[in-house]
Amino acid sequence: TGVSEKLQHSSNIEKGLKLLKDDGIRAVWNAVFPKNILPLQLGYSSSGEVLQTGKGVSDFHAGDRVVSNGNHAEYVVVNQNLCTRIPDNTDIKEASFTVLGSIALHGLRLSETSLGSKVVVIGLGIIGQLVCRLAEAQGSEVIGIDPDTKRTDMSANFYTSVEEANMTNVDSVIITAATSSNEPIEVATKIARNKAKIVVVGDIPLNISRNDFYYKELELVVSKSYGPGRYDKQYEILGKDYPIEYVRSVSYTHLTLPTNKA
């Protein structure tokens, strides 16, 4: 979250840079964050060391290196369901991206793809890149789409357009773009096979055509952050877990898996 999300479109970035050059960082801050929304906590993916634990916490101890959905601050308080230990062979700075990995992982799980599936990822920001890596790791055939050549240059399987990729009959399209344009969802319906699944992870409008979904019997799912338990006060604040026989992968497991290196 934060300034990067507020300035996600190129026109806003140009305005922000000009304001920064002319009037300084405080002017940019005041323009992006009006006074009526302060105080504001920035960020949701952090790593650090446990200083102290509360009553009833038995899984963590002072000195443990952990990742969490805590804000970007020197000190944060986080429920144990939203923390996981950092493996000894993982750098603490690298681990700070874990929550982003869990968002990518949850989106991929919702796509219900597997070995040999054809997956297209639209939007190659950091979460889109992580979805691609995870999908490749499970043995899927992955194509990434993004208009930014700096992003597509990172892999031979990344393209600036669907026409360039020449991809059809896709099993699942995962949209990780952040845009006000309706193009991502329109593109997804065109390249998806009959009965395919479209998963929306990014912030996009959903002005869908009924006919596009009707004739192909497409399934649309909007991914919720890093999975079951998110925004549930019983889970996030009171620390009550879900029964494993009903919910196999919760927010905690999605946090835990990306911390382990292959």
Annotate each PLM feature:
Residues 211-249:
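Rossmann-fold dehydrogenase core element
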Residues 1-46:
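N-terminal glycine-rich beta->alpha transition that marks the start or flank
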Residues 156-221:
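Glycine-rich cofactor phosphate-binding loops and adjacent beta1-alpha1 units
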